[in-house]
Amino acid sequence: MKNNRFRISILFFTVAVAMLGFGIVIPILPFYIESFGASGSTLGLLMATFAVMQFVFAPVWGNLSDRYGRKPILILGVLGTALCHLLFGLSSQLWMLFLARAMAGILSSATMPAAMAYVADSTSEEERSSGMGILRAALGVGIILGPGIGGWFASISLSFPFYLAAALSALAVLPICAALPESLPPEKRGLPGTDVSGLQPGALWQALFGPIGFLLLLAFLLSFALTGFEGIFALYTFKLYGYGPERVGTIIVLIGIISATMQGLLTGPLSKRWGETCIIQISLLVCAVGFVLMLQAETYYEVLLTVGFFIIGNALLRPAVTSLISKSTTRAQGKALGLNNAYMSLGRIFGPVCAGFLFDSNISYPYLIGSTVMLVGLFGSFFWLEDAPLTVKTNCSGSKESGQI
């Protein structure tokens, strides 16, 4: 158990630092590409390029980790991310920005499937939700604190935060190489179901009708809603309250603290007490209500409270869904978790685009649609999560039911 904690601590550090670079880009990207004479539509294409590459390559990396092990894929993902940050900061032409973002989408998508599969290899089913929560906390720390760091260091130069992110990512490789053992023994590699062909035509559609289909749909819905929220949050608060980058950055940092605390400390105990299915249902309801409350906020502190309420639900929802997906298979966990990341990437493609279109029509529409999406997931969970492929299922009343894998 002590070894597992040490290994997961290394993964926490690695994922947090790797995702920090992604977060750093959020507040800087619009200003950075503007210096190249690019328009808002170019910004949208640039963001979509990153998300599309993640969507396509996440299952490929998950499958490769089933074939060759978790450690080499982790190293490749983190080092590749460092290189992409450096290239982005050194870019002098618009095409170089697109190349750097495309490469970042490809290589950064290797980190999370391999890290989550590592946790799945190293933990029991009872401990897995807690382990996934710790990884999600690392994800939250990196992505949420990144915008604050990016905004603060952008005063030096718009390219400086990218150099900083590259240096930190390169540093994160050291503990992986020096202290993280491989979690997947050679005899378990390349088992049936671990082909490395990645996304075949219709594979994602077929997965929706498989044993984890509804869980993959939930992964898409929560990613769609959250990235829609994030995509227009700065625009929404600027238009409604006149908030500038510093105040928005402060809100995002507070969101990160809440998210990391919830995922790192409460996910495991709550899942053991009530089970993932109950956590998912409660979290979907909290997120739906949070979207609506956001529309009612009038003061800065009310904005903080309503955003915090929404983030609590989201922080519990992500690891619960991921944990159920990892429990759906005892062999091809990397592939299943790669599909999970692919559906989340698909949500990241459409979420900001739809939110931006809705925002142009009415600034309240993105949050109303976000609430509706969460309610659709909630109602669906009452019908389809009963068939989740678990050894033991726990409902919200605390009683347990036997299931199958």
Residue ranges and their predicted role:
Residues K2-N3, P181-L217, S399-I405:
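Juxtamembrane intracellular "pre-TM" segments in multi-pass secondary transporters
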Residues P27-G40, I232-R247:
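Short amphipathic helix-loop junctions that connect adjacent transmembrane helices
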Residues F55-S92:
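Conserved MFS/SLC helix-loop-helix module at the cytosolic interface between two early adjacent transmembrane helices
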Residues A58-Y68, M262-E276, F359:
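Helix-to-loop junctions at the C-terminal end of transmembrane segments
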Residues A100-V141:
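Cytoplasmic helix-loop-helix junction between adjacent transmembrane helices
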Residues L135-A178:
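Helix-loop-helix hairpin linking two adjacent transmembrane segments in secondary transporters
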Residues T277-V321:
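C-terminal transmembrane helical hairpin of 12-TM major facilitator-type secondary transporters
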